[in-house]
Curated annotation (Swiss-Prot):
Residue ranges, annotated region (Disordered): 1-80
Domain of life of the organism encoding this protein: Eukaryota
Residue stretches of biased makeup (Acidic residues): 66-80
Any one GO MF annotation of this record: protein kinase binding
Classification via InterPro entries: Speedy
Protein name: Speedy protein E12
Family: Belongs to the Speedy/Ringo family.
Pfam families given in the database record: Spy1 (PF11357)
Amino acid sequence: MGQILGKIMMSHQPQPQEEQSPQRSTSGYPLQEVVDDEVSGPSAPGVDPSPPRRSLGWKRKRECLDESDDEPEKELAPEPEETWVAETLCGLKMKAKRRRVSLVLPEYYEAFNRLLEDPVIKRLLAWDKDLRVSDKYLLAMVIAYFSRAGLPSWQYQRIHFFLALYLANDMEEDDEAPKQNIFYFLYEETRSHIPLLRELWFQLCRYMNPRARKNCSQIALFRKYRFHFFCSMRCRAWVSLEELEEIQAYDPEHWVWARDRAHLS
């Protein structure tokens, strides 16, 4: 009986720590090796106030990255002298000039060229040999007025050409006598019925014959149309000389730009 109790006591005695086999994790590796690879720091509980040390290799790599990031910024940074050179100012001036030219769209040039083929307008231009009512600047103002009125190009008809030409003469010419002839060409009168002096026109109206009454009513209607056309341009009838030259520069070889009073001898 004593021997049996002695064996039982020997089986329950703890074995030395060196002989105990280390516990293994579910993956089959020792638990101590896994903890040493993943956890760093003291085994005692608590938080270490000192930050973890970074290796010199990481610091050197971070410095190289910072230097590589700074290099494109240095290359892309413009020099301050290139911003304030005179060429930049000239470029801005040319850009503003192109913007002013774009106000007159090509469709208004096409409408102007289409109306030049009108037989009544052809007769007016052929009659005005002295260029008193249709020189190149007055005709360029017609294109400017078409642009300012803002109608679609296909809507411009013969009446609009005469309205614009008459309004251009109102703005630029002081002599009223030649301007009155525009009425007669508009209403397709013959050359023999066109008075050359303004006094002859008032003399016709004074007698108040049926033909004179008809002419007076047509002139009154024309002036009414002229007022509406002037309002459609927002009362902007003045055109600068620079804008007129830019309109002519769109097609400098056009035959109407040869109608220059300076070339008359």
